[in-house]
Structures are given as structure tokens and as C-alpha cells.
Amino acid sequence: QLDNAHNDPSYFLNSSNTSKEKIQIEFVSANPTGPLHVGHGRGAAYGDAIGRILERLGHEVSREYYVNDAGRQIDILACSIFLRKFKCFSKNEFPESAYKGSYISEIADAIELDIGITKSEKESLIDNLPNDNEERIDTLIERIKINYPKAWSSIRDFGLSYVIRSIREDLTKFKVIFNNWFFESSLGELSDKKSEISKALAKVQKDHAYEKNGAIWLESSKFGDDKDRVIIRE
């Protein structure tokens, strides 16, 4: 159809489609940990163009943005904002695996908290950290969660909302509108056996998954994938 449209610009105007379908297109879906970049803009234009073509052919199209708001990267976002908010590191010493963009400082300045941190508390927070960059940020995340749970929750929620609002505004200016913003957190936790993600996992494990080396693997190679994929790591 694209070849026909390329050769004849009026192709879609004259095309009649008798097999109309409901089609969902999930695109952009950048992690809500910072502003969109040019690559995301390209994906937005591409996905929206596909949606418009399918709509012109008579299909019912739903555009979805999948918001990964439940992963480790969101913890790193919250940790980065916390460290900036309370000036735990100098500019040159800021953790390598933390987010360092100017937007982190903007969020830190914008959020209002009813707690403060003393100099000795800051020193304790950043004392004796691992040398490995990933272990260092994970240790900071764990310490902040344990010692400042209320501030952590407020910063995490505020930072996530701030970034998502910025993404929405940029996409609106780009004239790309999504029918649905699906939040990964709505699936619940694996620790909750009644959650949607636990129910889905149980169905998959019944017929299309297996355990190996302490991890749960999806038999995706049976469905055209080049290899099986890990669902739950050990």
C-alpha cells in the first residue's frame, strides 16, 4: 500500500477497505526520567504517521504511550533529585550513574519539602560508598528510602509528574496526541498474588515459560524470536 501511495498520491483518497480492524499503536514510550530528545521526536512522527494512514484506510486506531513508571530508572530519577535538593555532592562529585541534566536542578528547586538534612546526615548518607558506579547509586537509593521515606515518596511522585507533564507538553506542541497513557505501575507488584501482573505471569508460566538458573524464562523462540527472554531475574 505504501508503494501504491508513493506512485499515486491519490491512492488513499480512492482506496476502499472492507476489512476494518481495531489497531493499537504503542510508540515513543520514552522512560519518564527526562525530556524527550530528537530520536523520540522521530519516533513520534513515524508512529503518528502510521496511525493516520491506518485511519485513512478505515481502521479504528488507538495510540498508546506506555509509561515505565515502576522500574529502577525511576528510583535513580528520585535519587538524583534528592541529592540535588539537599546538595549532598559538589557538581564535580555527583554520582556517575545519576541523572545530571539541568532539569534535575529545576525539579529540585520546584519541589517544596517540610524536612531538612544536617551536614552530619549528608556525610553519613554518602560515606563509605562502593566504587562501582551502579552499586554506588543503588546504595544511595537504599539509604534514602530507609532514612527518609516520606521525602523519598514526595520527591519520587513529584519528579515523575514533572517529567511526564513536560513530555505531554512537548508532544502536544508536536501535534501528536495519545488516546491512552498506560502506567506500568497500574499492573501492581509481583508480591501481590492478586495483582494484574501476577495473574498474567501465572497464565504465561502455565504454558509458555520455564525456570532456569533461578530465573523465569519466556519461550519466545517458539513464536519467532531469536532466543528466549527472561521474565523474572534471579
Segments the model singles out, each with a brief description of its role:
Residues 1-234:
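NTP-dependent nucleotidyl-transfer catalytic core
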